[in-house]
Swiss-Prot record:
SUPFAM superfamilies: Ribosomal protein L13 (SSF52161). This is Large ribosomal subunit protein uL13. The lineage of its organism: Archaea, Thermoproteota, Thermoprotei, Desulfurococcales, Desulfurococcaceae. One of its GO terms (cellular component) is cytosolic large ribosomal subunit. PANTHER family: LARGE RIBOSOMAL SUBUNIT PROTEIN UL13, RIBOSOMAL PROTEIN L13. The keyword Phosphoprotein does not apply. It comes from the Archaea. One of its GO terms (molecular function) is structural constituent of ribosome. Keywords: Ribonucleoprotein, Ribosomal protein. Belongs to the universal ribosomal protein uL13 family. The gene is rpl13. Part of the 50S ribosomal subunit. Gene3D superfamilies: Ribosomal protein L13 (3.90.1180.10). This protein is one of the early assembly proteins of the 50S ribosomal subunit, although it is not seen to bind rRNA by itself. It is important during the early stages of 50S assembly. One of its GO terms (biological process) is translation.
Length: 155
C-alpha cells in the first residue's frame, strides 16, 4: 500500500524478547491496515509458560501422527521459528478471504537480521515485551530445535 507521497508503508519489528501471541496480534492488525511488516530475530521470540509443557504441546501438534495410512496424507506443520511465527499470525487473519491472504503475503519473518535490513530502525512494542513475564518462558528457537530445526537460515 502506498502513502500519498508514493512510498510504501513498511515497518521492521525486532522480535527478540517479545511474547509471541501478543506480537502476532499487533502484527496481524498492522497487516490488515495495509502495512508491509518485516519481523527479524524470530528465533528470540518468547513463548510464556513452563518450557517443558510448551515443548510438549508443540511436539504433540507437530510430530503427532494424524494418519496411520500414509505419511503423505498427514498435515504438514511448521518446524522453523519463522514459519511457527507466521503460522501464529495466520491464525489471527481471515485467511480464507482475499483480504487476509493479501495481508499474509505482506509479512516477512527472518531468523537473525538479513543484510538488506541492517541499518534500518527496528520497532519494539511495549505491550508485547517479555519483561512483564515473571519467570517461566522459552524462546521460539529452542522450541524449534526440539522439533527438529537444525538452526540454519531458510531461503
Amino acid at each position: 500500500m502506498l502513502l500519498a507521497g508514493g512510498e510504501a508503508r513498511e515497518i521492521v519489528v525486532d522480535g527478540s524478547g517479545m511474547i509471541m501471541g501478543r506480537l502476532a496480534s499487533v502484527v496481524a492488525k498492522l497487516l490488515l491496515a495495509g502495512w508491509r511488516v518485516n519481523v527479524v530475530n524470530a528465533e528470540k521470540i518468547v513463548l510464556s509458560g513452563d518450557p517443558r509443557m510448551v515443548v510438549e504441546s508443540y511436539r504433540t501438534t507437530v510430530l503427532g501422527v494424524k494418519s496411520h495410512f500414509s505419511h503423505k496424507w498427514r498435515p504438514k506443520r511448521p518446524r522453523t521459528p519463522q514459519r511457527l511465527f507466521k503460522h501464529a499470525v495466520r491464525g489471527m487473519l481471515p485467511k480464507n478471504k482475499a483480504r487476509g491472504r493479501r495481508a499474509l503475503a505482506r509479512l516477512r519473518v527472518y531468523v537473525g537480521v538479513p543484510d538488506e535490513l541492517k541499518g534500518r530502525e527496528f520497532v519494539r512494542f511495549p505491550e508485547a515485551d517479555a519483561s512483564r513475564l515473571s519467570s517461566h518462558y522459552i524462546e521460539l528457537g529452542a522450541v524449534a530445535r526440539q522439533l527438529g530445526w537444525k538452526g540454519g537460515v531458510e531461503k
